[in-house]
Amino acid sequence: MSWSISSNQLNIENLLNEESLFFTGNGYIGVRGNFEEKYYDGASSIRGTYINAFHDITDINYGEKLYAFPETQQKLVNVIDAQTVQIYFGEEEERFSLFEGEVIQYERHLHMDKGFSERVIHWRSPGGKEVKLKFKRLTSFIYKELFIQEITIEPVNFFGKTKVVSTVNGDVSNFVDPSDPRVGSGHAKLLTVSDTVIEGDFVSIETKTKRSNLYAACTSTCRLNIDFQREYVKNEKSVETVLTFELTEKAIMTKINIYTDTLRHGDRPLRTGLDLCQKLSCLTFNDLKEQQKHYLDKFWLYADVEISGDQALQEGIRFNLFHLLQSAGRDRFSNIAAKGLSGEGYEGHYFWDTEIYMVPVFLMTNPELAKQLLIYRYSILDKARERAREMGHRKGALFPWRTISGGECSSYFPAGTAQYHISADIAYSYVQYYLVTKDLDFLKSYGAELLIETARLWMDTGHYHEGKFKIDAVTGPDEYTCIVNNNYYTNVMAKHNLRWAAKSVAELEKHAPDTLASLKAKLEITDEEIAEWIKAAEAMYLPYDPTLNINPQDDTFLQKQVWDFDNTPKEHYPLLLHYHPLTLYRYQVCKQADTVLAHFLLEDEQDESVIRDSYHYYEKITTHDSSLSSCVFSIMAAKIGELDKAYEYFIETARLDLDNTHGNTKDGLHMANMGGTWMAIVYGFAGLRIKESGLSLAPVIPKQWQSYRFSIQYLGRHISVSVDTKGTKVNLLNGEELTIKLYGKKHQLTKDEPLEITFNNGRVD
């Protein structure tokens, strides 16, 4: 049923990718799928364990630095390594390694319904000693600090002295690749070991970042199910626990690791972690596996998408949803990085990806988790205000293009700070959350203030010209076209932001007048200012070309030459690695969906013919060099009725990391694309939309499938949607009846009467 991904052969060329694919995490910590015993000398590996939002500060070096360029950036830190376990057999101490001796059997699995990974191995040493080994690991969703390993050693023809060396190592570095702008360069060594402690059966290491003054600690303890001797080897930066025993029967070693840091655990993370490890050390792997299964049963009840007709795509969608869950921050300090907790690509920064591509998944399947992701943005609102002032704005909030703790980390402003649309993207996500939940407390505590401050940014950025409100010198989502006037995406999202700032005031006036009075006083809001938001939204200039019947990406986009795609070698993609930015800026060539994305998010701003013609125009000139693109084109192809094309794009998005189609899975998984896979099904094939008027659906089914099914949460209801070649069925599984739109017509949905619509030759009459 595609609940696992597996690797059944040891492929040296794919080990780096598998480190990302088989990572385990829980939103707080992420552990790459490295081998406990490591590889061979000289082998490439990105050995990593990460704590969400745990970062250091590094300088940004410029050849020429101008006003308001960020001076420093935050960088996700590779923290203490507790994965390592070496095993030695016999008096001569033959070390277990998959790269020596003979591998008789090798299997590797990530169980997405149970929440753990394992390796199953049958190995013969160079000296002929034969054993079976099983390595299991689990990062707990119940105890966020806990990462547990279980190693089973079963004798086949060898019985005798065995030594297991478990290491906790604070001498770790970050991965760097100066040749790839998508990976960090320089600043590899970010941690220093501040303390090593052995207390009873527990070993601890505490480390400190160089400049952010954050501490991270790891406490570890090991136990065996048979008699053994224990000793310790304490070094300056690591501690080894050495377990020696006679292997006469199956031996099972359990290693419990607890991670803590100053952001969540105060100024004594080592002591806190040690106490917690002592408290949890009685837990077995099976105990935690059972708890993990219970947690995931609830997650999959709401989040699972079932596809009948394509096993590979079924595997892909579950894989993507599971890794999104493993990477989603659950506190005010954290969010979802571009690579989640699976790797160091983009240095662990949070982008607009979260709000536009990832929040929708949780919004419709786990609204409480979506809420936590949005609260993170509110927690850095003051820093966004500071950034706006730094950028010359008298009012408003400008959110950083890439960040961890709230400061701008982008050193290349044309494709960074200039992407002002991120503030409107966050506002859009806040509005979607409110429409799906009607959470008035959220609007009172977070939503209205953020919507108002982002609206103020547009009023100070834009200006009126010939009766239209225009926004100059910005960059839209397409990073091959920078610093333009009136980017369609930016303008239409700003329009939405301005409208909803005014609507949020109206909502509070109606439902929470006391809160509104306090907010008006705090932010010094006047009725005249609110009226200006409405006026600017109504006057917003949205570029339109009547000859082509499309929305131009910006004021000058159509004046440029079209890129010579026919004579661009395949090996020159992605273009950003082979052409100077100015070269790209001079042509009509898109890295990713821009105007097409705007037509998805705010489809009511244009009629169907403009959306269709724009899709066809931009499809010809979009490279999809960004992993954020294919899912959007899939959604919009489905909308305009081009199902075969929608399916082609969906295939690309569903297995992008599993098949490493972008060639950089080793640096971490593409989290936005993972959210996009779900969106391509639910927003694309099923046609789901959330608007002020309510929830609407218009499902279609690709000819390659027999059926598909998913469920959503909406206004406290649990709704399932099933689609097959015969038609569509919508069930209300829990909650009060409500009105929804199905294929453009209003229907009352009740528990007793599912809505069923029959297809006629694959279409609705």
Curated annotation (Swiss-Prot):
Substrate binds at residues 352-353, 591-592. One of its GO terms (biological process) is trehalose catabolic process. GO terms for molecular function: alpha,alpha-trehalose phosphorylase activity; carbohydrate binding; hydrolase activity, hydrolyzing O-glycosyl compounds. Pathway: Glycan degradation; trehalose degradation. Keywords: Glycosyltransferase, Transferase. Disulfide bonds: none annotated. Coiled coil: none annotated. The active site is at residue 479. Pfam families: Glyco_hydro_65C (PF03633), Glyco_hydro_65m (PF03632), Glyco_hydro_65N (PF03636). Its EC number is 2.4.1.64. Belongs to the glycosyl hydrolase 65 family. Homodimer. PANTHER family: GLYCOSYL HYDROLASE-RELATED (PTHR11051), PROTEIN-GLUCOSYLGALACTOSYLHYDROXYLYSINE GLUCOSIDASE (PTHR11051:SF8). Catalyzes the reversible phosphorolytic cleavage of trehalose. Phosphorolysis is specific for trehalose. This is Alpha,alpha-trehalose phosphorylase.
